[in-house]
UniProtKB/Swiss-Prot annotation:
UniProt similarity note: Belongs to the bacterial ribosomal protein bL36 family.
Keywords, ordered alphabetically: Ribonucleoprotein, Ribosomal protein
Coiled-coil annotated residue ranges, if any: none
NCBIfam families: rpmJ_bact
Name of this protein: Large ribosomal subunit protein bL36
Database matches in PROSITE patterns: RIBOSOMAL_L36 (PS00828)
A Pfam cross-reference name: Ribosomal_L36
Gene transcribed to yield this protein: rpmJ
Length: 37
């Protein structure tokens, strides 16, 4: 899980979702998981 100021899709399978006001990226590739912090 990467925590960064701006989250971006890193590949076509990445999805940007909003959970409880936190932007997250979920993907099949665990390296692509991100959270906005």
């Amino acid at each position: 899980m990467k925590v960064r100021p701006s989250v971006k899709k890193m590949c076509p399978k990445c999805k940007v979702i909003r959970r409880r006001g936190i932007l997250r990226v979920i993907c099949d590739n665990p390296r692509h998981k991100q959270r906005q912090g």
